[in-house]
């Protein structure tokens, strides 16, 4: 690709998707101390810039600073956070946002850390296969073509850092076609229920994610329940040392263990999500799927009330992350990806073509765990019924649903296959 053609394509950012290559920097890594030092300085710069912006907000005489002409990326992030704050205020005034809106807050003076962004002109790519951050000793191996790299970020993650190499990829042209479709319903026991008009349903097992969550919750609760054998009123010769040195040290160790638990949990869930979505993408490409419709209700994790045990699992599963993974993989494969609202899709009967909305009485009902009975007494998988209704609801809303497509979906709604991807 010539520079002239490349410049013309990159001018339109809608053709571009930015991806990351991640490198984990643990506490034992040779670059950990330097990453920590840089992140601490970024935090100080963030707080200093935030102070100026907050003063301009409270005091009309102080000029509001716009950092778009400043090359310092950290200061631009502060400016971005304030613009987001004002945008949310505007939405709230129109009734489009119902959650509290607060000013950006200062980061903790000692424990606080902040992202360190390096634009392309602040990194060196002279050594083939390596990215070096300017004025540091940090040099990271990379498989990315140096012409595609647009920057690097050092991201604090509690007990470790992630160095992200950012690179741009040109998205293939996506043609909207509803002749070969797939519908995805996210859930708990079945992480994703996938239906289509060209292949039989696939149920991706969600129990590995539940077990990861339960183990993390169990271990974290144990750590929170730990109590020191020393008590503040204990009569001892070294009482001052116990209160001033040993107590804080024990609390610090407990916090490190807790951060380690949640960090490991997050990494394991990310790994499983990537494996599941990659497996699904291979299946979609194999069957030449043109459009994927995935169900999701905005705020569903915050508004549900399914009991303590279910909430512990459901609320902690990052479905938004699962959706974003599948979305960018579909974009790279040239598949049209749509996220659709899914209310009442599990209550209405797909076989009976029941209108997907609230009814006093429904044509079908769930008779036992995992099964849905239609008005004709036919038993089908409940998640398959919900998945098919997600696609039907969206396609009907845009006028692309036909009797021919409905009959195709009926032919392929039987014999669902359950898949468990190894962790």
Identify the residue ranges that each predicted region occupies.
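Nucleic-acid substrate recognition interfaces
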Residues: 1-423
